[in-house]
Amino acid sequence: MKMWSGRFREPLDPAFDHWQRSLQFDWQLLPEEVAASKAHALALEAAGVLTAGEREALHNALDLVTSRFHAPDGSGPSWVMSNQEAEDIHHFVELQLVATVGDLGLKLHTGRSRNEQIATDLRLFVRSRAQMLQAYLGTWAEILVARAQQMGNAAMPAYTHLQRAEPVLVAHWLLAYAEMLLRDASRLEDCVRRLNYCPLGSGAVAGATLALDRGIASQALNFAAPTANSMDATSDRDFVLEFLQALTGIALHASRFAEEITLYATAEFGFVDLPEAYSTGSSAMPQKKNPDLTELVRAKVGRINGAAQAVTLLLKGLPLAYNKDMQETQEPLFQATIATHQMLHLLAKFTHALQFRTDHMQAACESGFLNAMAAATYLVHKGIPFRKAHEIVGHAVRLGLDKGCELAGLSLDELRSLSPEFGADFYDAVTLESTLDCHDVLGGTARAQVQASLEAMQRRTGDLVNARGRIDLGLSTVAEVSHADS
């Protein structure tokens, strides 16, 4: 029997009936549906609709549904999806209750609508997944920090316009990505803060027709408070869109990391050696080791952002309140959540196993005039305005290019032909160590500043991990040193 069949004389067209069902994807909301149903039962008991015994019987029956769904053999999802009668997860759970406790199972729907049920289920789903992804972000950030600590004072070129710019510590580069991940975690926290209100009691559109204490269900589900407007509560999917936009930000940051690793793994750079456990070969070229993981990460941003774009278009122009269009927001949500979860899990393990060729990185810092900024700063300390110092060092670079040498390879006479302010102390000012340390400002790549940043980031990632938990990646320790690092 349909949940709404009383008004209709004709049965649904079989093709349409199959097409409009959502159980094939909203089965993923079963834990949330059970939790929301338990909370609603508490409100019904307080309102005198259910006796304490009836409420307990419903709770026990709902527990049986949960136990079957989480069967050790993993058959739970197929058990739900194979049901031929239920049109959605709400109907499925009701059918299971009726099979267990008879007509009492039908009584649970008193004072509630599927419109508020799905709004509640989705808020619970997004909240739990946002917090789970925060744990993955914290775990990956923690590994980035551990790898940064291993790098010590090893340096690498930093790039602007994909051209060598200035040397930075490898740790400074790794910590840049940790900063991005903490911002991503913060966006998820903001998303949770705005969605954390309970729609139960909103009814189909105008509010429940029973005098329910909405605070009971809200408190039982750990929401901050009940929602304030029934029309908004049943039709709001802002939180889905905001969550997907936050996932897009995560994917964008992951894709930047993936792109750099893909480049740095080429023979032309030679800065990293890809872990074999996360690489594949070629069916035609025996010598190949391909960066499939990082290439797929780059591609995933398209799918995740595509989910956000799809939901944007689905919600555009919808009149108040609930419309069936909103059912279509679920698949993009589920798919993007799974893709982000899998991506972060693999990137954390990949980063742990990544082998840095610090000898190649360091060698790359010694050519390409990466100390030109330090040379200009040297002249500034001699009293020359920066614009003039910039011009003078530019001429020195041109002279070095013509001679085939770096700035330190120019003689003092050659340098003084460009400016009399050059002295013998110039050569100490443009060593790699001096070039790094001239950036001695908060957030700069000077060795002392990076050490301070590293210690601060250890505390910040620790706070996130303590709040959301550390994901067990099956690694011996996040600080394990790769013996291939050199």
Curated annotation (Swiss-Prot):
Superkingdom of the source species: Bacteria
Subcellular location: Cytoplasm
Any one Gene Ontology cellular component term annotated for this protein: cytosol
One Pfam family, short name: Lyase_1
TM helices/strands, residue ranges: none
Family designation: Belongs to the lyase 1 family. Argininosuccinate lyase subfamily.
Protein name: Argininosuccinate lyase
Organism in which the protein naturally occurs: Acidobacterium capsulatum (strain ATCC 51196 / DSM 11244 / BCRC 80197 / JCM 7670 / NBRC 15755 / NCIMB 13165 / 161)
GN (gene name): argH
